Swiss-Prot record:
Originating species: Arabidopsis thaliana (Mouse-ear cress)
Source species, domain of life: Eukaryota
Entry annotated with the keyword Kinase: no
Similarity remark: Belongs to the glycosyl hydrolase 100 family.
Protein name as it appears in the record: Probable alkaline/neutral invertase A, chloroplastic
InterPro entries: 6-hairpin_glycosidase_sf (IPR008928), 6hp_glycosidase-like_sf (IPR012341), Glyco_hydro_100 (IPR024746)
Gene3D superfamilies the UniProt entry points to: 1.50.10.10
Amino acid sequence: MNAITFLGNSTMIPSQCILRAFTRISPSKYIRDTSFRSYPSRFSSCINQYRNADSDRIIRPTNAVPFCTDRQSSVTAQVVSEARSHSASTTCANDTTLDQIYTKNGLNVKPLVVERLKRDEKDEEAVNEDEEGVKRDGFEGVKCNDVEEEAWRLLRDSIVTYCDSPVGTVAAKDPTDTTPSNYDQVFIRDFVPSALAFLLKGESEIVRNFLLHTLQLQSWEKTVDCYSPGQGLMPASFKVRTLPLEEDKFEEVLDPDFGEAAIGRVAPVDSGLWWIILLRAYGKITGDYSLQERIDVQTGIKMIANLCLADGFDMFPTLLVTDGSCMIDRRMGIHGHPLEIQALFYSALRSSREMITVNDSSKNIIKTISNRLSALSFHIRENYWVDKNKINEIYRYKTEEYSMDATNKFNIYPEQVSPWLMDWVPESPDSGFLIGNLQPAHMDFRFFTLGNLWSIISSLGTPKQNQAILNLVEEKWDDLVGHMPLKICYPALESSEWHIITGSDPKNTPWSYHNGGSWPTLLWQFTLACIKMGRPELAEKAVTLAEKRLQADRWPEYYDTRDGKFIGKQSRLYQTWTIAGFLTSKQLLQNPEIASSLFWEEDLELLESCVCVLTKSGRKKCSRAAAKSQILI
C-alpha cells in the first residue's frame, strides 16, 4: 500500500502562489512503487490577470495545480513517506527565485521547512557555468553563419510558453499553413533535438520546465473506449490552451494527448523512453543532478520502467509493441519487436540504472533493469545482426527444427531472404546492420536508420557491429543519404507489399514519408554515432550536404524519391525538429567532447552477468560466451 504523510499547513515566507491538491484518485489503479501519485483532472491550469505580466506562478508538485495570484497563502504539502535518506526537493520551476520544499535527514520529519533559494553568483563562477547553470567550455568564440542564424531564429520562434515560462517547441510553425492539424502541439519525441540544441547553447530553463510539466501529465487519467492503459505512460504531445474566465481573467491549461486523438489511437510507447533519455542528458550537460534526484522525478522514472518491465506472455527480452508506436507512427509493418523501440528501450534502461537512487526500496528494480539489459543486449547482438555470412547462413537454414539446440530458433524460411538483400549487402565482412524486426517465422530485413544509430549510441551492438553499421552507411551512401540525409528505412515497400503491409496508405507511398522518405532530423543522431565511433568526417559530409538545401527549401519535414531529391509531397515546412537536428549536429561537430555526455560506452559488467535460468536447470548450456567473444575492446 502507498503511504503518505500529511504535514499540516506551513506558512510560506513569503508566498504569492497557491498549490491546490487534487483528490480525484482512480480507485481502480495503484502504483507498485512506494511513492504516492494522484490523478488530476483533465487540464493543468494557470490563472492570470488579463494583461498582467507580473503575475506570480508556480509549477505544482506531483499532486497540485498552479494558480497565479497576488495573494499570500499557505501550502498543504503531501510528502512521500518513503523518502530517501538525504534531502530531496520539489522545485517551483517557473519562478525566477525558486521555492524549495524538502525534508531534513530522512523521512517523516516535522515541521516542513520552506526556504527561498536565491541565485548565488559566486557559486556559479566556482563551477564555471553561465547564468542558466550550463557548462559552456568549448563554445566561446564560435560564430554562426547565415543558415545557423536563421535556424536559431526559427527555433526560438517555435517556443511555447505556459504561465509566461518556456515549456517546449511546436512541431512545425509554417506561417502560410492554415490547417496545422496537431503540428501546433509540443511532442515529446520532436522536442528532444530542440532540447539538446538549447542545452548545448547554455539554455536549460526550457528543458527543465518541459521535463517537469510532462512528468506531471504522466499521472493523468487517460481512457480510450472505457479502457485505461498502464500507469507510467507519457503523453505523445500536449497543447497550451487559453480559456476565458470572468472578470477579465484567462486560464492557461495543458491539454495532453496520450493517443486518444492520434491516427489509429496508438499509445506513444517511445515517449517515456525519450523522456528518460532527455532527463539523463540534462544532468550530464548541465551538471545539475538535483532534478533527477527529486522524489517525484524518481517516481516517474520507476513508473516508466515498471510499465516497460511488466511481465507478460513474451518469450523474448525485447519490448512487444503495436504498429505506429514510435517515430514511424503509421502502419508500416513494424508491429512486434521493432529495432527502434528496442534501441530506445535499452538506452532508457541504461539511463534509469544510472539515475535511480540506490536504497532498500529501489534495489529490486535496479536488479530487474540490469538483468533485462543483459538479456536484451545478448538477444539483439545474436539474433538481429546480419552481414553477408549471416545472410548466407539464413539462406541455407533447415526449417521445422524441434529441439533445444535448433540452429533456426525462430523457424525462419529461407525464402524470406529477398533478392534485393542478396544484391545489396556488401561483400566486405566489415559491413553489416541490425535488421528491423524479429518474430517467429519472420525477419524484417529492411534497414531502419534510427534503430541502427541508437544501437551505436547506446552500445546495444558490439563495438565491431557498431563500426560495421557505419561502414555500411559509407558504402551505401547513395542509397541511405543521396541528396538529403537520411533515409528513415531502406528499401521502400512497393507494389503488392505496399498494398498489403501499409493498407494502401496514400501518405506512405513508395519512397515517401515513412516508406523510404529522407528525414533531416536524423542528422543529429547520425552525427552523435559518428563522433562516438571516431568517424566525424562522415557526419561533416552529411551536415554539409544538408546545409546546402535546408534553408532554401524552408526546412522541410521530409524529402521524397529514391535519392531524396524532392521535398515531400505532404511535407510540412519550417519543421522544428529539422531545424533543431541541424543545429544540434553543428554544435556537436564544433565541440565533439560534449558528445560523450550523450552516448554510452560498452558495459562489461552487463556481459559478465547471465540470467539464463536454463543453465541452472542443466537443460541447455549458456551461450553468453558467444556474445562476449564478439567484443573488440
